[in-house]
């Protein structure tokens, strides 16, 4: 009897395919009041499992604490400003107030969402143009997006840009990195599996076997191109 497919095991909902408790137990965003003006001091720089970039803990002048993504070059006891037109490293400003050409990160896609774009280690975006009520931002992928002027962003580039310079060397190290973030790894092709693991597996009878599967196929056989009208490139003419 064959084994269950990967999608069957994931759909069951076991701990092996669930988020680890405590992985994202730290809130990393901006203050909810978009009109608030604060001044804070960096009290601690630390790493967290749920983020590739280092984080910084900030103590504000109203005696509250918060966490934000740390920029390259920040250090403990540095001042960080929120809502003020003070363009210092790590400060939070409206993108409509930031001069063109300045590097930014942790950008809000809609005003008040706390930052959704450009958050990974070493990434940075640039303010390229100011339009009527909107701002053009160039992302690390070189794609341009037009965002509301009231969206906020931090100044600088995300720290930790050299995290991928050191090679992994062995598969075991990659194993722990992937499992910390609940990535599906390793992901192998069905034709490289054993016959007991996948309908496309095995060395025999691989040639000429269709990858198309009926819509009414039972679980365990329903893999490949399900009820496809065609496969491959479209024929000309």
Residue ranges of predicted features:
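Short N-terminal amphipathic alpha-helices
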Residues: 54-56, 69-70
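Short acidic-glycine loop/turn motifs at beta-strand connectors
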Residues: 60-63, 141
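Structural recognition of beta-strand segments within beta-rich domains
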Residues: 50-52, 58-60
């Amino acid at each position: 009897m064959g084994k269950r497919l990967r999608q069957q095991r994931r759909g069951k909902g076991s701990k092996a395919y669930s988020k680890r408790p405590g992985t994202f137990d730290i809130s990393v965003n901006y203050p909810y009041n978009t009109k608030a003006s604060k001044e804070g001091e960096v009290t601690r720089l630390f790493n967290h499992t749920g983020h590739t970039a280092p984080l910084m803990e900030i103590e504000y002048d109203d005696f509250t604490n918060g966490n934000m993504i740390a920029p390259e070059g920040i250090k403990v006891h540095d001042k960080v400003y929120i809502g003020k037109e003070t363009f210092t490293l790590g400060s939070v400003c409206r993108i409509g107030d930031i001069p063109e050409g300045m590097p930014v990160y942790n950008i809000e896609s809609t005003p008040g969402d706390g930052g959704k774009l450009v958050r990974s280690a070493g990434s940075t975006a640039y303010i390229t143009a100011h339009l009527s009520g909107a701002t053009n931002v160039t992302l690390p992928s070189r794609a341009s997006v037009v965002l509301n002027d009231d969206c906020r962003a931090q100044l600088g580039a995300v720290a930790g840009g050299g995290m991928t310079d050191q090679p992994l060397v062995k598969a075991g190290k990659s194993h722990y990195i992937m499992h910390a973030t609940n990535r599906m790894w390793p992901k192998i092709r069905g034709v490289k599996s054993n016959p007991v693991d996948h309908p496309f597996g095995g060395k025999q009878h691989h040639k000429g076997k269709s990858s198309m599967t009926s819509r009414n196929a039972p679980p365990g056989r329903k893999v490949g191109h399900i009820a496809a009208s065609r496969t491959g490139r479209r024929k000309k003419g």
